[in-house]
């Protein structure tokens, strides 16, 4: 799509973050809200929002960078999918050197505490937060 303004602006992700496993969240009707929330809570940088051609109020695809990694999301569901329950069985882990700053910013933006940010038996400071979309985030500050 050479005429796409998001691509024409040069607002493309660093190829280094486009490797490995990339989480892709389906947030039925809430992807734009999540996109903005992740900028406030986790300092996310935007690499593009692409509306659904049939329903321009919904995002077909959105892409951000958080802490050097890529996160993708959509408002759309495949026709065979039903509305998803709160995500379970995984979390998104942020490994950082300044855990207190990440923790404070996420709480101020609206995350709730699942586990407090404390020193763990393996030596790291670690926590678990839940964002308003039901996604659990762990902040890990490795022991020095």
Where are these regions (language model features)?
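Vicinal oxygen chelate
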Residues: 1-19, 51, 60, 65, ...
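Core segments of cupin and vicinal oxygen chelate
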Residues: 15-17, 25-71
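GST-like domain detector, emphasizing the conserved glutathione-binding G-site
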Residues: 84-88
